[in-house]
Regions:
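Aromatic-enriched hydrophobic runs in primary sequence
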Residues: 24-30, 57, 68, 80, ...
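A positional/architectural concept
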Residues: 1-64
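Charge-rich, low-complexity linker and terminal segments
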Residues: 1-15, 75, 79, 86-163
Length: 163
């Protein structure tokens, strides 16, 4: 999503409203792929006398990932407020600042950053998810006709323990 800031540059100190949606690519976080729906972004922007743009607003989206306990599908509502300054003709490779050139300002980096910062540490399918149910293989009843792929290894282990 890009903002046309030409009016703000012509009228420093005056706020201009904006709203729209911003797509965010899937994110890999600690080895887990998190899918993020399109973000609804709304707020205001204002230029200062040096051409820097202050952008403030709110983003709302939904993120999806496997449950940390049981690996079923889980999702979380993401809401985050932001206030950032975009530096005119700043270094676009600098990860510490937001920058823009000309009269158009892209909020993609801002939206992605603030969305990732608001993600939960762990996704849960429900608050009281018990996780996987552990079944002790030694006490589990053996059902006739079912083949257990590692049964042969268990026999080898038992034979090596006898020696």
């Amino acid at each position: 999503m890009e903002l046309d800031v030409s009016n703000a540059l012509s009228h420093p100190g005056q706020e201009f409203p904006f709203s729209g949606t911003q797509a965010i690519a899937d994110q890999e976080i600690y080895g887990t792929i998190v899918q993020i729906d399109d973000c609804l972004v709304e707020g205001t922007f204002m230029a200062d006398d040096e051409g820097n743009i202050n952008v403030k607003g709110r983003l709302v989206t939904r993120a999806h990932a496997p449950c940390a306990n049981c690996l079923k599908d889980a999702s979380a509502e993401i809401e985050n407020d932001f206030t950032e300054d975009f530096i005119r003709n700043g270094d676009p490779e600098d990860d510490e600042i937001f920058s823009y050139e000309g009269h158009r300002l892209s909020v993609e980096k801002l939206v992605m950053s603030y969305t990732v910062m608001a993600l939960p540490i762990r996704f849960l399918c429900r608050e009281d998810c018990p996780g996987f149910e552990y079944k002790d293989p030694d006490t589990a009843p053996v059902e006739p006709g079912i083949q257990y792929p590692f049964a042969g290894l268990k026999q080898l282990l038992e034979q090596s323990e006898e020696v």
